[in-house]
Swiss-Prot record:
PTM comment, free text: Sumoylated. Sumoylated form can be polyubiquitinated by RNF4, leading to its degradation. Desumoylation by SENP6 prevents its degradation.
Record note on quaternary structure: Component of the CENPA-CAD complex, composed of CENPI, CENPK, CENPL, CENPO, CENPP, CENPQ, CENPR and CENPS. The CENPA-CAD complex interacts with the CENPA-NAC complex, at least composed of CENPA, CENPC, CENPH, CENPM, CENPN, CENPT and CENPU. Interacts with SENP6.
GO biological process, one term: chromosome segregation
The keyword Ubl conjugation belongs to this UniProt entry's keyword annotation: yes
Cellular compartments annotated: Nucleus; Chromosome, Centromere
GO cellular component: cytosol; inner kinetochore; kinetochore; nuclear body; nucleoplasm; nucleus
UniProt family annotation: Belongs to the CENP-I/CTF3 family.
Gene designation per UniProt: CENPI
The protein's name: Centromere protein I
Organism name: Homo sapiens
Top-level taxon: Eukaryota
UniProt key word Nucleus: yes
Keywords: Centromere, Chromosome, Nucleus, Ubl conjugation
Biased composition (Polar residues): 10-28, 35-50
């Protein structure tokens, strides 16, 4: 609403009868009759800001016209014809214009809702009134209750009822309270009998349902409707929610991972809402740092749900109405038991009042409040989570900038909002299912550039699920972008997938500790979970091998690939999960023959950790019992031993070109090395040659030429100590754990038989 409404009564008293006079005459008459405290400011406006005065006059005229229109509808003729009554059409257009431009106050919505549902006017008029019910701020719960009471009278048509339910679902988050509406749950449920109303009533019930609303007779009714109408998505949604609260009452199988149950009810009002947001758009706020404590977010000028501005935190019952004399005793008693969110300032305060907190009507406001994030994470109230996920899904879809071309100018606001979501997910150490659904829907449309950092961070927080289900929805599309993008994008994707693997492993490691492994149902579940993790690792291995070919064995890319396998090699020991997956040959041999010392050092460390994990797995009796379940076969040990033999041959025994490594003999002959088959070791390896030269120059600084082949015997041991002193800890761990120091050097492999 425009701010001029607050002085409406004063201006009405000062309005003169000189309607045909000029604006200056009217302003003079109004200026003389103002209070002395206000006259100075008003006079200043009149002298220095004539444009503002004209705008003020236009807004006041618009406000007056709206009041006249509302008064006309409130006292208007019964069953007036729209086509014949020009006055009616004039007032309808006035209401529509103001609603689309500024939104309507809660008092005006209260009056117009009663008019639309009371049947005073024709069906066409009622439809137009309902379509322009756009709130400026909030909608009063009492207005909704009175509107629902008109449905019992039966004076409005079926199409009007459908439109009202669609409006109620679309505006659900902007109703100031829900207690009285929830008491009408039985009435709404009875409306499921109407086939036209059923989808929208199901959606409303889905938003309202609490555990106490789930009754056996309602379950039977829903099952009867499903048998009559078939597997309708809206019925499945309500049944799924009922099954969550009372699994014993519902034995039928329901889809587990269905993403979309309801059609978007906001489509009718989308244009008007966008107009309100455009008019009231304020400057983009800076991203907020999520800290433990209340968030002091300054309210902005926006009057509608917008992703670029998180809703301001307001308790549904902490309003100015608490001081009104006409408030009922029951309302006072109900409100006295709840703790206002505005007064929540510290974590101890949260613990003391956790039993009497009342969450806000706009659930999106919890994103900026770490205390409320703690609350919804600990309490796990399903209706609360459903409300939050519904809000998040709708707003992500509304504001995603690559869905709509005209939204690119708001890219910074959308980016800031995604940053807020990511901070909340990091704070909770858990991903939101609404973001997962958003990724599945938007990835095919994503160009790989817009909001890249935020998008890939959302990928890393996808909740754990079956890889086979996620792959066609996400990873297949991601692979197409991966192969056709720059090396920097490839590295970003690998980093994101490493974080995704870490989050999945943390979730599974916590889950396995909360439940006994000896329970047979869990064994099956854990085996399936390990299979999903294994498929994710193999998927990254496939991406990495192909990327190395595309990027000509780029060292920068190889660093990110080995970072991923540093996480993979320690799954068994660090996360206590029965899984060991080796890297593919294309990655192993690329790293082994790399010219970069840090790459080879990193490979040595990974091989050392693989050895530790496989040795621990071999000794563990639990793994022996569940060997077939978790695929700890001799093939894994044989593959590791083969890698180990190749590494020792390249770094220690000077026998590199055995099984697994092939280089064209013509290329080897061009190197000019006489006995190339016996020349590659820790001294002659291309990545260590500079170290060998530096070592020899330290011993004999006066020498003009050096012979690296002279490093043998005692010099060999001194040279190793020199390498270890240069920070090559991976090489040090590998040689000390995997090389047998004797007169005949050989690799210390792992016995792949059942007996260790």
């Amino acid at each position: 609403m425009s701010p001029q409404k607050r002085v409406k009564n004063v201006q009405a008293q000062n309005r003169t009868s000189q309607g045909s006079s000029s604006f200056q005459t009217t302003l003079s008459a109004w200026k003389v009759k103002q209070d002395p405290s206000n006259s100075k400011n008003i006079s200043k406006h009149g002298q220095n800001n004539p444009v503002g005065d004209y705008e003020h006059a236009d807004d006041q005229a618009e406000e007056d016209a709206l009041q006249m229109a509302v008064g006309y509808f409130e006292k208007g003729p019964i069953k007036a014809s729209q086509n014949k009554d020009k006055t009616l059409e004039k007032h309808l257009k006035t209401v529509e214009n103001v609603a689309w431009k500024n939104g309507l106050a809660s008092e005006e919505i209260d009056i117009l809702l009663n008019i639309a549902l009371s049947g005073k006017f024709g069906n066409a008029v009622n439809t137009r009134i309902l379509k322009c019910m756009i709130p400026a701020t909030v909608i009063s719960e009492d207005s909704v209750v009175k509107a629902v009471s008109w449905l019992c009278v039966g004076k409005c048509s079926g199409s009007t009822k459908v439109l009202f339910y669609r409006w109620l679902v679309a505006m659900f988050d902007f109703i100031d309270r829900k207690e009285q509406i929830n008491l009408l749950y039985g009435f709404f449920f009875a409306s499921l009998q109407d086939d036209a109303l059923c989808p929208y009533v199901c959606h409303l019930l889905y938003l309202l349902t609490k555990k106490e609303n789930v009754k056996p007779f309602r379950v039977r009714k829903l099952l009867d409707l499903q048998a009559k109408m078939g597997m309708q998505p809206h019925l499945q949604a309500l049944l799924s929610l009922y099954k969550f609260f009372a699994p014993a009452l519902i034995s039928v199988s329901l889809p587990v991972r269905k993403k979309i149950y309801f059609k978007n009810s906001e489509n009718l009002w989308k244009t008007a809402l966008l107009a309100v947001k455009q008019r009231n758009r304020g400057p983009s706020p800076e991203p907020l740092k999520l800290m433990l404590g209340p968030a002091n977010v300054r309210p902005l000028k926006r009057k509608w749900n917008s992703l670029s501005v998180i809703p301001v935190l307001n308790s549904s019952s902490y309003t100015k109405e608490c001081g009104k004399k006409e408030m009922s005793l029951s309302d006072c008693l109900n409100r006295s038991g709840s703790f206002p969110l505005e007064q929540l300032q510290s974590f101890p305060q949260l613990l003391q009042n956790i039993h009497c907190l009342e969450l806000p009507s706009q659930m999106g406001s919890v994103l900026n409040n770490s205390l409320l994030l703690h609350y919804i994470n600990c309490v796990r109230d399903e209706p609360v989570l459903l409300r939050f996920y519904y809000w998040l899904s709708q707003t992500l879809q509304e504001e995603c900038i690559w869905y709509k071309v005209n939204n690119y100018e708001h890219g910074k606001e959308f980016t800031n909002f995604l940053d807020t979501i990511i901070r909340a997910e990091c704070f909770l150490q858990e991903g939101f299912y609404s973001c997962e659904a958003f990724l599945y829907k938007s990835l095919p449309l994503w160009d790989g550039l817009c909001c890249r950092s935020q998008f890939l961070q959302l990928v890393s927080w996808i909740p754990f699920s079956s890889f086979s289900e996620v792959k066609p929805l996400l990873f297949d599309h991601l692979a197409q972008l991966f192969f056709t993008s720059t090396i920097y994008f490839k590295c970003s994707v690998l980093q994101s997938l490493k974080e995704l693997l870490q989050n999945w492993l943390l979730w599974l490691s916590m889950d396995i500790h909360m439940k006994p492994v000896t329970n047979s149902p869990l064994e099956t579940t854990l085996g399936g979970s390990m299979n999903s993790v294994s498929k994710l690792i193999h998927y990254v291995g496939w991406l990495s091998t192909t990327a190395m070919r595309l990027e000509s064995n780029n060292t920068f890319l190889l660093h990110f690939i080995l970072d991923f396998y540093e996480k993979v090699c320690d799954i068994y020991i660090n996360y206590n999960l029965p899984l060991v997956v080796l890297f593919p040959p294309g990655i192993f041999y690329s790293a082994l023959l790399s010219l970069d010392t840090s790459i080879l050092n990193q490979l040595c460390f990974i091989m050392h950790r693989y050895r530790k994990n496989l040795t621990a797995a071999k000794k563990n009796e639990l793994v022996q019992k569940t060997k077939s379940e978790f695929n700890f076969s001799s093939k894994t040990y044989q593959e590791f031993n083969h890698y180990l033999t190749s590494m020792v041959g390249c770094l220690w025994t000077s026998k590199p070109f055995g099984k697994g490594i092939y280089i064209d003999p013509e290329i080897l002959e061009k190197t000019g090395v006489a006995e190339y088959k016996n020349s590659l070791n820790v001294v002659h390896h291309p990545s260590f040659l500079s170290y060998a030269v530096s070592f020899l120059l330290q011993e004999s600084p006066e020498e003009r030429t050096v012979n690296v082949s002279s490093i043998r015997g005692k010099k060999w041991s001194w040279y190793l100590d020199y390498l270890f002193s240069q920070g090559l800890q991976g090489l040090k761990l590998f040689i000390r754990s995997s090389v047998h120091h004797s007169s005949i050097p050989r690799a210390e492999g792992i016995n792949c038989n059942n007996q260790y």
